[in-house]
A protein has these predicted regions:
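Detector for Asparagine
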Residues: 10, 14, 44-47, 54, ...
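C-terminal catalytic/scaffold cores in eukaryotic proteins
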Residues: 13, 27-30, 76, 92-93, ...
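Generic surface-pattern signal
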Residues: 24, 28-31, 58, 62-66, ...
Length: 144
């Protein structure tokens, strides 16, 4: 049997995704103007966050990710959401080692709920395409 590993777009590096993959556009390390802009939004109000995810995550990733990348991203988050004791707070912590920082004023009060909302958006944007490609992903109402 021959297995081809999925690569990052335009790269030779193997593709992987953590449950926090959708947060990458909101990283503000060394991006003061971006932090100032994002600080206007309340991450605890998903009505405010939805347009940000649509514009800075889905719109960008739809141009570069194929259905297999989308499936890997969704399945990673789905697996975490299905794990009853998964520590979503850990994904939101500032990380000096990787230089991962959110806007200073972003304090997400209900991390699991925040990631459930992200999964819902993923399913809305990518679910049909991923399912039609043969992947088994859970609809949001089965895991939320």
């Amino acid at each position: 049997m021959f297995i081809v590993l999925l690569k990052y777009p335009n790269s030779t590096v193997n593709f992987s995704a953590s449950p926090a993959h959708a947060l990458t556009p909101f990283q503000v390390y060394d991006r003061d103007e971006w932090e100032e802009y994002l600080s206007q939004y309340d991450p605890n109000d998903f009505n405010q966050m939805k347009p940000l995810f649509n514009e800075y995550f889905f719109k960008v990733k739809n141009k570069i990710y194929n259905v297999h990348h989308k499936a890997v991203v969704m399945l990673s988050l789905e697996k975490a959401l299905l794990a009853e004791n998964y520590n979503f707070s850990e994904l939101l912590e500032f990380d000096d080692e990787t230089c991962f920082y959110f806007p200073y004023n972003w304090k997400i009060k209900k991390p699991r709920s925040f990631f459930k909302d992200i999964y819902y958006l993923m399913f809305t944007n990518w679910g049909e395409e991923v399912i039609n490609a043969g992947y088994k992903i859970s609809p949001p109402n089965e895991i939320l």
